[in-house]
């Protein structure tokens, strides 16, 4: 039994499907009735995630056209489960015949085999990045809910292959204006790398071309910011907001580390440097800086939510790598065929945004049941 495919408490999401199966999809349960939602709302987010958009992504071409099967009537959510489906159109399973019994280094081939005794070797099966189609579709629904509360989410690539973008130091500021965040998002979306720094984006692309020519891959850093998040979200002690965000982001394939706010830098700061001073502004409590990343004690403060994640290099590379043949019991060398992203961070951005949206939507619904007044 594979029991880890459902996420959330009140706003619950179950993804299903494999990379080379007939289709892939998601069921969203717990979305309140009365929210305007169309296939175009979902398609807009899926188009940002889909492969084949630039030289920075895999050459697999999938339209990723979504079909909403239930939960919507005349463009309005009904409060019943929302089921969404995307057909797989461009799978080339023959590319994977040679690795049926030879687990690829860096992939989940070996661990899925050990756990279940059987695995779908075609494109990674359930462990493929293709699974994130369902996450992004569900995230589109969550974002429609969050828009009712004025929440905005934006993600971007801040580092790729050791090349860093020149960006504001968000932790040094207690707030981020909506216009500034939307500008960052627009600049990121205009870049094939999804990096809002045009000069850094150009250097990243050049590096990516070089790495691809070498038959190799590179990783990077993705950041996600959420503003307009109301204070009070989070359920201590085990369902803290930052704990759920970390789980959500770590559940994305290739993500190897997550930071909230100052993150690992906080280990090098003194308390006087780490603590965010409070002050009154227009009758409301605000913060002079945001090392906490918008969360204290597992509960949102109302300041921007700041998340960063380290994304490892794509494990599928053309270079020869040592592995084993699980039938013959011998050591062998393989080079991975197929169409793969030379670097994953640009495509992880909409997935990471979706996971943050799912967590915030879930906690907004939970908070509405936490107190009467």
Swiss-Prot record:
<dbReference type="GO" id="GO:0004107">
    <property type="term" value="F:chorismate synthase activity"/>
</dbReference>
<feature type="binding site">
    <location>
        <position position="49"/>
    </location>
    <ligand>
        <name>NADP(+)</name>
    </ligand>
</feature>
<dbReference type="GO" id="GO:0008652">
    <property type="term" value="P:amino acid biosynthetic process"/>
</dbReference>
<feature type="region of interest" description="Disordered">
    <location>
        <begin position="42"/>
        <end position="61"/>
    </location>
</feature>
<comment type="pathway">
    <text>Metabolic intermediate biosynthesis; chorismate biosynthesis; chorismate from D-erythrose 4-phosphate and phosphoenolpyruvate: step 7/7.</text>
</comment>
<dbReference type="GO" id="GO:0009073">
    <property type="term" value="P:aromatic amino acid family biosynthetic process"/>
</dbReference>
<keyword id="KW-0274">FAD</keyword>
<dbReference type="Pfam" id="PF01264">
    <property type="entry name" value="Chorismate_synt"/>
</dbReference>
<dbReference type="GO" id="GO:0005829">
    <property type="term" value="C:cytosol"/>
</dbReference>
<keyword id="KW-0285">Flavoprotein</keyword>
<dbReference type="GO" id="GO:0010181">
    <property type="term" value="F:FMN binding"/>
</dbReference>
<keyword id="KW-0288">FMN</keyword>
<keyword id="KW-0456">Lyase</keyword>
<dbReference type="InterPro" id="IPR000453">
    <property type="entry name" value="Chorismate_synth"/>
</dbReference>
<comment type="function">
    <text>This reaction introduces a second double bond into the aromatic ring system.</text>
</comment>
<dbReference type="GO" id="GO:0009423">
    <property type="term" value="P:chorismate biosynthetic process"/>
</dbReference>
<dbReference type="InterPro" id="IPR035904">
    <property type="entry name" value="Chorismate_synth_AroC_sf"/>
</dbReference>
<feature type="binding site">
    <location>
        <position position="297"/>
    </location>
    <ligand>
        <name>FMN</name>
    </ligand>
</feature>
<dbReference type="InterPro" id="IPR020541">
    <property type="entry name" value="Chorismate_synthase_CS"/>
</dbReference>
<protein>
    <recommendedName>
        <fullName>Chorismate synthase</fullName>
        <ecNumber>4.2.3.5</ecNumber>
    </recommendedName>
</protein>
<feature type="binding site">
    <location>
        <begin position="312"/>
        <end position="316"/>
    </location>
    <ligand>
        <name>FMN</name>
    </ligand>
</feature>
<keyword id="KW-0521">NADP</keyword>
<keyword id="KW-0028">Amino-acid biosynthesis</keyword>
<comment type="similarity">
    <text>Belongs to the chorismate synthase family.</text>
</comment>
<feature type="binding site">
    <location>
        <begin position="126"/>
        <end position="128"/>
    </location>
    <ligand>
        <name>FMN</name>
    </ligand>
</feature>
<keyword id="KW-0057">Aromatic amino acid biosynthesis</keyword>
<feature type="binding site">
    <location>
        <position position="339"/>
    </location>
    <ligand>
        <name>FMN</name>
    </ligand>
</feature>
């Amino acid at each position: 039994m594979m029991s880890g495919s459902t996420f959330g408490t009140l706003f619950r999401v179950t993804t299903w499907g494999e990379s080379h199966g007939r289709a892939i999809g998601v069921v969203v349960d717990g979305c309140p009735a009365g929210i305007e939602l169309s296939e175009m709302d979902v398609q807009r987010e899926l188009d940002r995630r889909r492969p084949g958009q630039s030289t920075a992504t895999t050459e697999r071409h999938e339209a990723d056209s979504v079909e909403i099967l239930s939960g919507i009537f005349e463009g309005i959510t009904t409060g019943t489960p929302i089921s969404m489906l995307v057909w797989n159109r461009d799978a080339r399973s023959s590319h994977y015949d040679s690795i049926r019994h030879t687990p690829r280094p860096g992939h989940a081939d070996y661990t899925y085999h050990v756990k279940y005794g059987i695995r779908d070797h075609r494109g990674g099966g359930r462990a493929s990045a293709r699974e994130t189609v369902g996450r992004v579709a569900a995230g589109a629904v969550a974002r429609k809910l969050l828009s009712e509360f004025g929440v905005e989410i934006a993600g971007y690539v801040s580092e790729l292959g050791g090349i860093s973008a020149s960006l504001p130091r968000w932790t040094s500021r207690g707030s981020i204006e909506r216009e500034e965040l939307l500008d960052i998002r627009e600049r990121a979306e205009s870049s094939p790398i999804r990096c809002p720094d045009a000069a850094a984006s150009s250097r990243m692309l050049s590096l990516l071309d070089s790495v691809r020519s070498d038959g190799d891959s590179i990783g990077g850093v993705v950041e996600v910011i959420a503003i307009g998040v109301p204070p009070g979200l989070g359920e201590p002690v085990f369902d803290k907001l930052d704990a759920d965000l970390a789980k959500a982001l770590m559940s994305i394939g290739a993500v190897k580390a997550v930071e909230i706010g100052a993150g690992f830098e906080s280990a090098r700061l003194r308390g006087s440097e780490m603590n965010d001073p409070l002050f009154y502004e227009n009758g409301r409590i605000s913060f002079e800086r945001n090392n906490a990343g918008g969360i204290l004690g597992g509960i949102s403060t109302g300041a921007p939510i700041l998340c960063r994640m380290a994304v490892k290099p794509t494990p599928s590379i053309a270079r020869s790598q040592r592995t084993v043949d699980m039938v013959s019991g011998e050591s062998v060398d393989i080079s991975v065929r197929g169409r793969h992203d030379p670097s994953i961070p640009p495509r992880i951005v909409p997935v990471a945004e979706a996971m943050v949206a799912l967590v915030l939507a879930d906690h907004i619904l939970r908070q509405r049941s936490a107190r009467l007044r």
